[in-house]
């Protein structure tokens, strides 16, 4: 997908905004590598914009999506991989050691982090900051704590970005959905800045994953900063079901019930209704079913009208039951 984007938008000067819906295959767990599961993913991307406003637009969109789905109790957890990367650069940790450290911090394995750091010859101040990472989660106090751990410029800029983003979210009443986790890292090396996940009750995995990947498209010849997210629809539906959330939606449409010998008339009526913007569902009338059963069927299908076409009605005349 990113290779196609890089080629198609290579010459674009202004930002590009995309959305997508499709099925993907993913490894469901690190314990079952190679065991793929199909998930439906809905997502959005903002390409060629590395601004704070772009970060805000994407995060606020995530919150709006969760609210629109009917969720009220959820958290969007924000981090910034640049903080971790800055500590790695200052300590000179690379290769397998860097990968192992990332994994341990991501898993909140405090003692594993401590053991690994003890085996490395690095500055005590940097080691202390890295050891704190698995515990750097919570409210805005986390950001103050993070800034007190290091004077590394890359790390300070990473925290400043989170603070500025939070202020924008707070000014627009999104702050109650926000928490922070500077130890929430990703095994995907292409993330370069803001990283986020959205969690709610009823699912053990994040419903939303996303972040900033400013150098990913550059690997395909299109050096454009990007940020985006994906909603795992399967997890979202599971959470809604387990929280007993039923989303009301605007019912619009007609159930067209016709006798077998009036199929042609029913088709003509459906064409006329559809031409006016009405959704139409056609079904053949069976003597074994009562009118009330068809009306109930329409209600279950979120159709507001039932039209019976039989010998009593001409092809351009229908009877509606609300």
What are these regions (language model features)?
Residues 61-68, 82-90:
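Hydrophobic mid-domain F-helix/FG-region of cytochrome P450s
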Residues 1-2, 322:
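Single conserved hydrophobic/aromatic residue that forms the stacking wall/gate
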Residues 106, 319-320:
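Glycine/aspartate-rich loop-and-adjacent alpha/beta segment that forms the canonical ThDP
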Residues 93-112:
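Acidic, His- and aromatic-enriched active-site or binding-groove loops in soluble protein domains
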Residues 4-12, 16-71, 117-319:
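Positively charged, Gly/Ser-enriched RNA/tRNA-binding surfaces
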Residues 76-79, 105-110, 157:
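Short acidic alpha-helix initiation/capping motifs at coil-to-helix transition points
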Residues 73-84, 101, 179-184:
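Short, surface-exposed recognition loops or helix-turn segments adjacent to catalytic cores
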Residues 37-42, 78-86:
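Short, conserved phosphate-binding/catalytic loop or strand-edge motifs used
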